[in-house]
Regions:
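Charged, flexible boundary elements
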Residues: 1-22, 283-284
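Gly/Thr-rich phosphate-binding beta-strand-loop-beta motif of the actin/hexokinase/Hsp70
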Residues: 18-45, 137
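A short, charged helix-loop
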Residues: 138-161, 250-256
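Glycine-rich, often acidic, oxyanion-interacting loops/wings at catalytic, nucleic-acid
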Residues: 167-297, 426
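Low-complexity, acidic/Ser/Thr- and charged residue-rich accessory regions of DNA metabolism proteins
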Residues: 346, 350, 387-482
Length: 482
């Protein structure tokens, strides 16, 4: 029977170092308080006794070599083996990431501790100095509280960089839309409402009209044929009817003072150009995201009906490598999609279910809840039915389906198989599964073709490519890529 520890938050890697050492005195803890120019370092043993007082180390290659040299000297002096040494500091920012990575490349174990937890370990809560912060970090490391296996590495790290960059560009795009609304409300009130102008807001026909000589008076005076030609070249359907509706509406709105029109038009033209640039950058990032997603286990999330590339990439990037990730129960708490529970008064005491915790990975939570909403609208039949049942029962359906989706997704990524309906998971015939694969294959292929990443996704060296080869061999079918 597996022994369970009451210290569930302790790092397995750090616990193994303590177990291998003869005594905790033969463990060297290198606590680091990162900074942009000079880090503060302190050596102590596993019992908490300081072996070397805090000293500074430059955030340079020379600083890395100097620190390693000092560690070797302390190991020789205190007769501590190299494999019983580990480094640790608060989850570092971008300016210290290369420093920690250099230590890992030299073969050292580098742990990261949560800054908020480290703050609670300090002796003095009122003040904050490098030395006080260092003591809190050292206590966290001695208590084996640290993350030694970053899940976001390699392809997962590259994917997370792209996902978070795209997320910020989407925020900028929303901000730009709001600014354009403010300008349009003065030049041509109501133009961005489809029921008024007949044009869907911020699509190409709408942008073409806004980027040059745009005001209610100018749209009203413009020749009908010129406006029809402009809308037709922009790809608008039924341009004649839309041009007529637009000019009729322009004759019935309030117009701005003439002395302000030129300035507002210049501002709007710049906004349209910036908006186009942001949209082009987002499209480029999505194509790159699809290529990196295809090289990870997260590609299997795309096989769930209702889940597209953006949602699959977002969840995969924040979870990281499923092989090194914690159990699903920990991930659910990490994502902030499980309510807090309070119970007291013995076995007969009542249980209070509160709201979800605010301390979580908000980005992962956002992508999971969005995925749950999509599954409730467009997902597999069993998931849509479950979403409706939870909603009818007064539960938070999106949170419930998000937890179920996370369990399903982790199982798919760890076992390298696509999503199967409930009736095909157990006691299903070979013919039933063969038919399911042949029916769903065109839809799966179209998802990847949308981003031009289908050849990468189904390459023999990538997870979906290996799954495709296995299915073709076992079920004697052909799943064509072209």
């Amino acid at each position: 029977m597996k022994k369970k520890s009451i210290f569930q938050q302790q790092s397995q890697e750090l616990m193994r170092i303590y177990e291998e050492a003869a005594t905790s005195k033969k463990v060297l803890v290198v606590a680091m308080d990162y900074a942009k120019k000079e880090h503060t370092i302190m050596f102590c043993n596993g019992d908490g006794y300081i072996l070397r007082k805090p000293f500074g180390v430059k955030n340079t290659p020379e600083g890395v070599n100097y620190l390693i040299k000092q560690v070797h000297k302390s190991c020789n002096y205190h007769k501590i083996k190299r494999k019983h040494v580990f480094y640790g500091g608060e989850d570092c920012g971008s300016y210290t990431e290369n420093f920690a990575q250099c230590l890992r490349e030299h073969g050292w174990l580098v742990a990261g501790v949560n800054a908020q937890d480290a703050k609670k370990q300090r002796e003095n809560i009122q003040a904050s100095t490098d030395r006080l912060d260092l003591l809190g970090i050292a206590r966290m490391l001695i208590n084996r509280r640290g993350n030694c296996s970053p899940c976001q590495s390699g392809a997962y790290r590259n994917l997370r960089t792209l996902v978070r960059h795209r997320r910020k560009l989407v925020v900028l795009t929303t901000e730009e839309r709001c600014r354009m609304h403010c300008v349009v409300d003065r030049l041509f009130p109501g133009f961005l409402a489809e029921r008024n102008s007949g044009l869907f807001p911020f699509h190409e026909p709408s942008l073409r009209v806004m980027e040059g000589r745009f005001s209610a008076a100018q749209i009203k005076r413009r020749k009908r044929a010129t406006l029809v030609d402009l809308l037709a070249r922009a790809g608008a359907q039924e341009p004649t009817q839309k041009a007529k509706k637009l000019q009729e509406y322009a004759a019935n709105v309030l117009q701005p003072p003439k002395e302000y029109i030129a300035t507002l038009q210049t501002s709007l033209t710049q906004h349209v150009g910036l908006y186009r640039c942001l949209k082009n950058n987002i499209s480029s990032l999505e194509r790159e995201m699809a290529i990196w997603l295809a090289q990870t286990q997260g590609a299997f999330l795309m096989t769930v009906r209702g889940i597209g590339m953006v949602l699959a990439a977002g969840v995969t990037a924040e979870i990281g490598n499923p092989a090194t990730q914690k159990p699903v129960n920990n991930l659910v708490s990490y994502a902030g999609i499980i309510p807090r529970v309070s119970q007291t008064g013995g076995s007969e005491g009542s249980t209070y279910v509160g709201s979800v915790a605010k301390r979580c990975n908000r980005i992962l939570k956002d992508y999971l809840v969005q995925s749950a909403s999509h599954l409730g609208l467009h997902g597999a039949d069993d998931l849509m039915a479950d979403h409706k049942r939870r909603d009818a029962a007064g539960q938070h359906a999106n949170y419930g389906i998000a937890r179920r989706y996370l369990r399903i997704g982790m199982h798919m990524m760890r076992h390298c198989h696509i999503y199967l309906p409930e009736d095909l998971r157990e006691n299903s015939t070979l013919e039933a599964r063969r038919e399911y694969y042949q029916v769903t294959w065109p839809y799966l292929l179209d998802k990847w073709k949308k981003y031009g990443a289908h050849e990468v996704a189904f390459a023999p060296e990538n997870p979906l490519g290996q799954w495709r080869d296995m299915v073709q061999d076992v079920y004697n079918i052909t799943l064509r890529i072209k």
